[in-house]
Amino acid sequence: MGQGLFQKVAQVASRTLGVPQSTIRASATDTSKVPNTSATAASSGSDLNGMAVDAACQTLQHRLSTHLAAQHQCQLNLITFKDGVASGPNFEMPWIDVINSAYENRISLSATGFYKTPHIKWDRIKGQGRPFLYFAYGASVTEVVIDVLTGENRILRCDILHDCGHSLNPALDIGQVEGGFVQGAGWLTTEELVWDSEGQLKTHAPSTYKIPCASDRPKIFNVSLFDNLNVENTIYKSKAVGEPPFM
């Protein structure tokens, strides 16, 4: 599910490497670069890719720190990267100079990160196990007006409080919550499933059922994020915000 993934992984890379986001470019998924990626599904995009990007960036940062420590004769743990500058007890170097120096000294400047969700197991027969790493919570109150004679309805106001853990990007997450609500409203009010006498689904595309549009958004629409650190080890203690708002 779309969650502003490119922006979020760019934020993760920027934060881990200590460089401005303007220096980060995320490329589209391409099997020529990463042949075995997981599907963009189950609201797992930010969790999986964010942790993988963080792992890859930590690998790169360790290589660069090791190189700088040897070059400047200082302890590895005293080297920091912040705002595009590498600093140590006796030096400061812009990021571009660090990269050039590493390249000239034949330090590998590429890395792969991998992450899989831990602690997941489920026995279908026994109905036991842990199918999910964590749960996302939310509460909403919606005011609607309904014509009791025709059934015509309109959403007047909606107030939502949604649990995103420690949000990676509040603007993106609020937009996702808003979109999930409108999508869910359409699912419950206009997207009817109709089969013919032979069991063939007739309402199989937007051409055969009505989906909500921008005008179906409530005029008063208040969304707040419940800033509650995820107790699980997710990327910066955030939570998925793909399908949870829809439900």
Identify the function of each model-found stretch:
Residues Q11-M247:
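C-terminal catalytic domains of large/alpha subunits in multi-subunit enzymes
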